[in-house]
């Protein structure tokens, strides 16, 4: 499974797709937030790890529009690739999904209905481009400082 793209210039540990099992620790840990230590024994593909990753991905997809065939990212979508690698063929958890208005401004158009809360856009905007226009609002998405 290729997880590097989700962590490019970003490691808030928010998505939990990269969890690993570390010998001597009870809980799984996000690999993007875990410092390597001498003698550390890490399992990256144990049944426990793969089950946790699959469950996390299923939960992410449960609040994500099932519009893959009409999405402009179809065929080169990281979510599709990870879901495929984890053997996810259908959405196991169903229910009411969050809905947001599309956030439009002269500089950006963002569809928060597709947000998976990885915080990559916030990190890139604030830390890499140093614009500071995006901030975390709550568990349901982000709001730009320019659009209301």
Predicted regions and their residues:
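A basic, amphipathic helix-loop patch mediating RNA/tRNA/ribosome contacts
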Residues: 1-23
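Fe-S ferredoxin-like electron-transfer domains
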Residues: 16-17, 22-148
């Amino acid at each position: 499974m290729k997880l590097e793209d989700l962590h490019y210039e970003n490691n808030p540990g928010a998505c939990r797709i990269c969890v690993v099992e570390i010998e001597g620790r009870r809980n799984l840990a996000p690999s993007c937030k875990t410092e390597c230590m001498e003698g550390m024994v890490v399992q990256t593909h144990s049944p426990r790890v793969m089950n946790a990753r699959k469950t996390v991905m299923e939960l992410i997809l449960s609040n994500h529009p099932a519009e893959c065939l009409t999405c402009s990212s179809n065929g080169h979508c990281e979510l599709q690739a990870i879901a495929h690698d984890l053997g996810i063929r259908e959405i196991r958890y169903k229910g009411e999904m969050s809905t947001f208005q599309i956030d439009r401004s002269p500089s950006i158009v963002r569809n928060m209905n597709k947000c998976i809360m990885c915080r990559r856009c916030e990190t890139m905007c604030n830390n890499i481009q140093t614009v500071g226009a995006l901030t975390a609002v709550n568990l349901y998405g982000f709001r730009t400082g320019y659009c209301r």
